[in-house]
């Protein structure tokens, strides 16, 4: 199993670069190979996952490929069911606020996952409770094989959530490294300073 990240290069590089080891938590998805590399995982660690070796740092060889993780760094295990990890991210952010932990939670997936109820619940809860979660939605125009126009009301998926209070929305071109770095840097600084969620 392999899900390529071509066309997602800019945003994935940026996610990994703003992820602060020791402070932040990262919940990525199966297409986030460059995110994992950019966050500091090695090519060897990714290959160990891909060939299900016992020395895979995420699962000891028990996960399917493209499920990159390094729990000791808070690069958390990937769920195959898309969108469910947004709830995990919101829960971790709630604990971070409760225990006054400095840092943010970053969660990432494709745009079609925003059609899932899990995602709505997570964004709603993070907005209501003012949680430092950065929801990164990588929009390539298709959800598996379904065109975006057949699954969402707004041309830009994040705009479906524009009515939520305490929620900042930042648009960027995920193919453009500089635009993506600017967006992710702004998102992390905003979430950290204001303790509010952001959609990128």
Please provide the spans of the model-predicted regions.
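Cofactor-binding active-site loop characterized by glycine-rich and histidine/acidic residues
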Residues: 1-129, 136, 147-166
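Residue-level recognition of short, well-ordered coil/turn positions
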Residues: 23, 131, 192-196
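Residue-level recognition of the N-termini of beta-strands and the immediately preceding loop/turn
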Residues: 103-105, 133, 196-200
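Thiamine diphosphate
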Residues: 137-199
């Amino acid at each position: 199993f392999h899900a390529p990240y071509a066309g997602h290069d800019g945003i994935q590089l940026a996610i990994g670069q703003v992820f602060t080891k020791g402070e932040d938590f990262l919940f990525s998805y199966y297409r986030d190979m460059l995110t994992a590399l950019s966050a500091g995982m090695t090519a060897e660690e990714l290959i160990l996952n891909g060939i299900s070796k016992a020395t895979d740092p995420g699962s000891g060889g028990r996960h399917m490929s493209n499920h990159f993780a390094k729990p000791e760094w808070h690069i958390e295990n990937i769920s195959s069911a898309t969108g469910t990890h947004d709830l995990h991210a919101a829960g971790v952010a709630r604990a971070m606020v409760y225990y006054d932990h400095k840092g943010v939670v970053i969660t990432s997936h494709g745009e079609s996952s925003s059609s899932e109820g899990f995602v709505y619940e997570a964004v709603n809860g993070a907005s209501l409770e003012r949680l430092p979660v950065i929801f990164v939605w990588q929009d390539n125009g298709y959800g598996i094989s379904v065109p975006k126009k057949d699954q969402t009301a707004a041309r830009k998926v994040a705009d479906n959530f524009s009515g939520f209070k305490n929620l900042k929305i930042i648009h960027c071109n995920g193919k453009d490294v500089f635009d993506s770095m600017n967006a992710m840097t702004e998102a992390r600084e905003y979430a950290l300073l204001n303790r509010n969620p952001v959609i990128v």
